[in-house]
From Swiss-Prot:
Transmembrane portions of the chain: 11-31, 40-60, 81-101, 114-134, 156-176, 182-202
Subunit composition and interactions: Homodimer.
Protein source organism: Pectobacterium atrosepticum (strain SCRI 1043 / ATCC BAA-672) (Erwinia carotovora subsp. atroseptica)
Presence of the UniProt keyword Cell membrane in the record: yes
Name of the protein: Cation-efflux pump FieF
Length: 300
């Protein structure tokens, strides 16, 4: 496991947990003083943030363990499981917010000291923006699915905090239903984000192929490699930080085994240089052993 990857994803998970804890305490104070249902929505979301980030931290630490005899391909799938668990946490909180928003839109309530809630929400907005910026940087350098799921979660928090700020300002001006309507809208958006996150996690657990741009980059290296007659059966997937690449090379029948091995080994090193840490399996076929309808099926 790349130590740089391990350090970054662990730091991102710890940072998210710390921010969620601080914001939760602040929002309890603000909700207690204002009675705002949109702040209650934010408070519940922060509670889910804490649970999700703690789960994320534990799972990330587990996924960073090296491969062993029982898990020969590593523990990277744990990241997808963490993302799936987060999507379920978030969906539950979103449904709670939707129901609470509906209830309070039918029975609007006057807020107390909304300026307290506005200040706390503004602080939460800035803190979340800084966290999301850091998480985006980590995802760019690690492609961690668990950190990406956490980042999407906190991106929805950004929108939520902005909406709460507007709702509190409108309620301060006497528009009493604004608070509950904004809470309802926030709940719908968070539910959509959670379902999307869960879909991506399931696709990863089902070994979805690498993105098209990465697949094309791999194919371009292979088809232009000297000493081969063609290639076929390229299969790719990802587990945590590790890409898995498998393919068959078509080699001249008269090519010595040692030379065929060297060609495949050089190609493997070239692919690993472009995709560091990739797990690559290359099978070498005599071209005569490959059915004609399968030969050279791989194109860039």
């Amino acid at each position: 496991m790349n130590p740089h990857y391990a350090r970054l994803v662990t730091l991102a998970a710890v940072s998210a947990t710390a921010v969620a804890l601080v914001l939760f305490v602040m929002k309890v104070f603000a909700w207690w003083h204002t009675g705002s249902v949109s702040l209650l929505a934010s408070l519940v979301d922060s509670l889910v943030d804490i649970a999700a980030s703690l789960v994320n931290l534990l799972v990330v630490r587990y996924s960073l363990q090296p491969a062993d005899t029982e898990h020969a391909f590593g523990h990277g799938k744990a990241e997808s499981l963490a993302a799936l668990a987060q999507s379920m946490f978030i969906s539950g909180s979103a449904l709670f917010l939707i129901l609470t928003g509906l209830q309070h839109s039918l029975e609007p309530q006057t807020l107390h000291a909304p300026e307290v809630g506005m200040w706390v929400t503004l602080i939460a907005l800035v803190a979340t923006l800084l966290l999301v910026s850091f998480q985006r940087w980590v995802v760019k350098h690690t492609h961690s699915q668990a950190v990406r799921a956490d980042m999407l979660h906190y991106q929805s928090d950004l929108l939520m905090n902005g909406a709460i700020l507007v709702a509190l300002a409108l309620s301060w001006k006497g528009i009493t239903r604004a608070d509950s309507l904004f809470a309802l809208g926030i709940g719908v958006y968070i539910l959509y984000s959670a379902l999307r996150m869960g879909y991506d996690a399931v696709q990863s657990l089902l070994d979805r192929a690498l993105p098209d741009e990465e697949h094309r980059a791999i194919a371009e290296v292979i088809v232009n490699w000297p000493g081969i007659r063609g290639a076929h059966a390229l299969r790719t997937r990802r587990s945590g930080p590790t890409r898995f690449i498998q393919l068959h090379l078509e080699m001249d029948d008269a090519l010595p085994l040692a030379e065929a091995h060297q060609i495949a080994d050089d190609l493997e090193q070239a692919l690993r240089k472009q995709f560091p840490g990739a797990d690559i399996i290359i099978h070498q076929d005599p071209v005569s052993a490959v059915p004609e309808n399968q030969r050279g099926r791989l194109t860039a």
